[in-house]
């Protein structure tokens, strides 16, 4: 039997997509490399993906990036939109064994998540995004791989620092499993 998405997850996808757009539009640091910024939306995507799972993470990445592109540029850059969905899915799977909802975010969780997110960012932004740019848009390889390398490094650092801090902060607001006792 198929599991249906909860109302909570659907609402999280909508709100998460909106926040992704806002962060992607207004909380970025320009790099000097064309159409490539230091993004704060991916650390947020990491948090949402870990909390709500890979399907929600993928949809937040897809919807959020699509809306961001249309509101910023007037058109969508589908190769990178697809990659935002893929990285959201990867973040969600990377967080499967973590229990942020019950206040658990151990050093082991941090290390394991950051190894997975670094590997995911390398594959997605360093290989898939540039390859799709070449296949879909016939972009010059040197340009798109330069963008890909910078996006890879900046996303690894941003998710590693800001994403980890967001997850730690979120976990610290949750009640730890077994911490409450009946009087």
Swiss-Prot record:
It is found in: Cell membrane. It is a multi-pass membrane protein. Its main location: membrane. GO terms for cellular component: plasma membrane. Pfam families: ECF-ribofla_trS. The chain crosses the membrane at residues 10-30, 44-64, 74-94, 115-135, 147-167. Keywords: Cell membrane, Membrane, Transmembrane, Transmembrane helix. Belongs to the UPF0397 family. NCBIfam families: PRK13661.1. This is UPF0397 protein EF_2154.
């Amino acid at each position: 039997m198929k599991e249906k998405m909860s109302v909570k997850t659907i609402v999280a996808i909508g709100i998460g997509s909106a926040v992704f757009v806002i962060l992607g539009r207004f909380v970025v640091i320009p790099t000097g490399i064309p159409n490539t910024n230091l993004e704060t939306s991916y650390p947020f995507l990491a948090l949402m993906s870990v909390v709500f799972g890979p399907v929600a993470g993928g949809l937040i990445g897809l919807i959020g990036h699509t809306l961001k592109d249309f509101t910023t540029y007037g058109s969508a850059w589908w190769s990178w939109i697809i990659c935002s969905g893929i990285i959201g899915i990867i973040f969600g799977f990377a967080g499967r064994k973590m229990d942020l909802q019950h206040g658990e975010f151990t050093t082991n969780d941090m290390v394991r998540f950051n190894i997975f997110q670094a590997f995911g960012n390398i594959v997605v932004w360093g290989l898939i995004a540039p390859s799709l740019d070449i296949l879909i848009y016939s972009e010059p390889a040197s340009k798109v791989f330069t963008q890909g390398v910078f996006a890879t490094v900046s996303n690894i650092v941003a998710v590693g620092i800001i994403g980890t801090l967001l997850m730690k902060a979120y976990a610290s607001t949750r009640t730890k499993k077994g911490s409450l006792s009946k009087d």
